[in-house]
C-alpha cells in the first residue's frame, strides 16, 4: 500500500484491516520513500497505489518503478482518467467528486470506504474471513448513511466543540490500533490552513 499524505494515512488504516481480515503480511510505504529503498520486489504481490487526484508525482513515480519490474498494480483514485489509473492494471474508483477545501476529507472517507470493502472481499475470497462475519460487517456498512444523518443532526453541538478546540492553546490527538492513522489525518486537517 503506497501513497502520500492523506492517501498514505488511508493506506495505514487499510494495513490494519487487511491484517485483521486475512492472514497476509501487509507493508505500507510513503511513495517518495518507496523509490529509494532497497526493495525486494515479489511478483506474487499486488502493489496498491492510493491517490486522490491520480496525479501525485511521487506516487506515480513509485507506480512506474513497479511497472518497470512487471509487477501487478492496482490504484485507488478519485479521478479515473488520471495518469495513475491509466498506468495501473486495475482501478478501484472512490467517486468522491472534487474537493472544495484544502483538507481532503471527502477523498479520505471515500478511500477508506473502498479500501474497507476491498479488505473484506479479500478476506472472504481467501477464506480467512468466515462468511458469517463477512455478511455482518457488510450489513453494518448499510447503516452508515443513517449514522451520518444522525451525526449531522448534532451540528450545533459539533460547532460548539469546534469553537472550544479552536480557542484552546493546544490539542492532542490520541488513538491506538486502526484509529492511530485516523489521528494522524485528524492532526493533518487540524493544522491545515483554511482556504
Describe these PLM feature segments.
Residues 1-143, 176, 188-193:
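Glycine-rich phosphate-binding loops that contact phosphosugars or nucleotide phosphates
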Residues 151-167:
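A short, well-structured juxtamembrane/interface segment
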Residues 166-187:
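Acidic catalytic cores of enzymes that act on phosphate-bearing nucleotides/polynucleotides
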Amino acid at each position: 500500500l503506497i501513497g502520500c499524505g492523506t492517501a498514505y494515512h488511508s493506506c495505514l488504516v487499510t494495513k490494519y484491516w487487511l491484517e485483521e481480515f486475512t492472514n497476509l503480511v501487509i507493508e505500507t510505504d510513503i511513495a517518495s520513500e518507496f523509490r529509494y529503498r532497497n526493495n525486494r520486489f515479489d511478483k506474487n504481490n499486488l502493489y496498491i497505489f492510493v491517490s486522490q487526484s491520480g496525479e501525485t508525482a511521487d506516487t506515480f513515480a513509485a507506480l512506474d518503478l513497479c511497472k518497470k519490474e512487471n509487477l501487478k498494480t492496482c490504484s485507488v483514485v478519485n479521478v479515473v482518467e488520471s495518469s495513475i489509473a491509466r498506468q495501473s492494471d486495475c482501478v478501484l474508483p472512490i467517486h468522491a467528486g472534487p474537493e472544495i477545501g484544502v483538507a481532503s476529507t471527502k477523498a479520505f472517507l471515500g478511500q477508506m470506504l473502498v479500501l474497507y470493502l476491498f479488505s473484506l472481499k479479500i478476506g472472504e475470497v481467501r477464506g480467512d474471513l468466515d462468511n458469517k462475519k463477512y455478511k455482518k460487517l457488510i450489513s453494518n456498512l448499510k447503516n452508515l448513511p443513517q449514522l451520518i444523518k444522525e451525526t449531522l443532526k448534532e451540528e450545533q453541538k459539533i460547532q460548539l466543540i469546534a469553537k472550544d478546540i479552536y480557542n484552546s492553546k493546544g490539542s492532542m490527538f490520541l488513538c491506538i490500533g486502526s484509529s492511530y492513522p485516523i489521528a494522524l489525518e485528524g492532526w493533518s486537517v487540524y493544522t491545515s490552513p483554511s482556504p
